Amino acid sequence: KETAAAKFERQHIDSNPSSVSSSNYCNQMMKSRNLTQGRCKPVNTFVHESLADVQAVCSQKNVACKNGQTNCYQSYSTMSITDCRETGSSKYPNCAYKTTQAKKHIIVACEGNPYVPVHYDASV
């Protein structure tokens, strides 16, 4: 079974994007990372930093998660990210996404030993 940490990595880490500048990036990535199996995942963020840099956020600024839990952490520095958002015309199995690039602080929920990201909470 896929661990929560491995799932986070599959869903959110793309350290060396080949074609992030392309408007097709989200359509390709959401499919290749299995985020369109059974349904179209409505929103997803990919972080273009090393896994080590993203894991390090778990020892940075402690903040409350959207759901009120206290195990979320905000990155001290901005990170290069791409937001993928389902378009109005998207219909499973032909999931369609809008690709938006940004540089933002990321907020992740961390748990376990080692203490690693298991959920992507927000970007600010």
From Swiss-Prot:
One of its GO terms (biological process) is defense response to Gram-positive bacterium. InterPro entries: RNaseA, RNaseA-like_dom_sf, RNaseA_AS, RNaseA_domain. It is found in: Secreted. One of its GO terms (molecular function) is ribonuclease A activity. It catalyses: an [RNA] containing cytidine + H2O = an [RNA]-3'-cytidine-3'-phosphate + a 5'-hydroxy-ribonucleotide-3'-[RNA]; an [RNA] containing uridine + H2O = an [RNA]-3'-uridine-3'-phosphate + a 5'-hydroxy-ribonucleotide-3'-[RNA]. Residues 15-24 have a biased composition (Low complexity). Residues 1-24 are annotated as: Disordered. Its EC number is 4.6.1.18. Pancreas. Gene3D superfamilies: Ribonuclease A-like domain. Substrate binds at residues 7, 10, 41-45, 66, 85. Keywords: Disulfide bond, Endonuclease, Glycoprotein, Hydrolase, Lyase, Nuclease, Secreted. It holds the Pfam family RnaseA. Coiled coil: none annotated. It is an enzyme of class 4 (lyase). GO terms for cellular component: extracellular region. Glycans are attached at residue 34. The keyword Secreted applies. Belongs to the pancreatic ribonuclease family. Monomer. Interacts with and forms tight 1:1 complexes with RNH1. Dimerization of two such complexes may occur. Interaction with RNH1 inhibits this protein. This is Ribonuclease pancreatic. The gene is RNASE1.
